[in-house]
Amino acid sequence: MKKIILFFLPVMVFLSCSSSKKATIHDSGNTLTNKEKNDGWKSLFNGTSTDGWHNYGRQNVGPEWKVEDGVIHLSGSEKGKEGGDLVTNEEFENFDLKLDWKISDKGNSGIIFYVHEDPAKYHETYETGIEMQILDNGTPTRLGQPDGKLYTHRAGDLYDLMASKEVANPLGEWNHIEIKCVNGNLDFYMNGEHTLSTHLWDDNWQKMIAISKFKDMPGFGTFQKGKIALQDHGDDVWFKNIRIKRL
């Protein structure tokens, strides 16, 4: 019996440590450590309200967006009520953005950046901003969001422009992402893996746009400073631990 106990003890310790590490990544309670603060990180969500955010083209936040248990939740059941994409009050140029997201069954959403808020000229965030796709990809035995059948439209992709390495967690689990852009060098990370890299605003960027659904949107992907948006696609989606660092 003693040998059995001694054999399982290191395994139990290892599992405990692994669980704690995972919790640290995804359950920081929307708060920054002193080290993060000293390193220049800023929280974009305080866990209790949508302070610092508004719906695109308006000054308020519509009832579709709720804060529940330390999470921003777009309620699909409120579809048709006042909603719209949620955008930051501030603009960002060179930045490192991190957050956690979770999507509903067959859900669709996105994280859109470099959004130029001029609703009289650009009616939607995606007319100027660049998107990291959020999607229920489905599995070989379960149908996900139909958009996932399209190359470059799956979770973590640079939407309609570049496919990414597929590392999204199963439906119902949180995904941790990072979007980093410095002087046009764009990198995507998901769940600890580097999933995509490209350069914005050069000749190759223009070529990608020219064969995409954005080819007839003259403002798309042209602004080098802008707001961050969380997309209202009409499906339940959840966000937490939203933080950014200016670079």
List each model region and its residues.
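Bacterial Sec-dependent N-terminal signal peptides
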Residues: 1-28
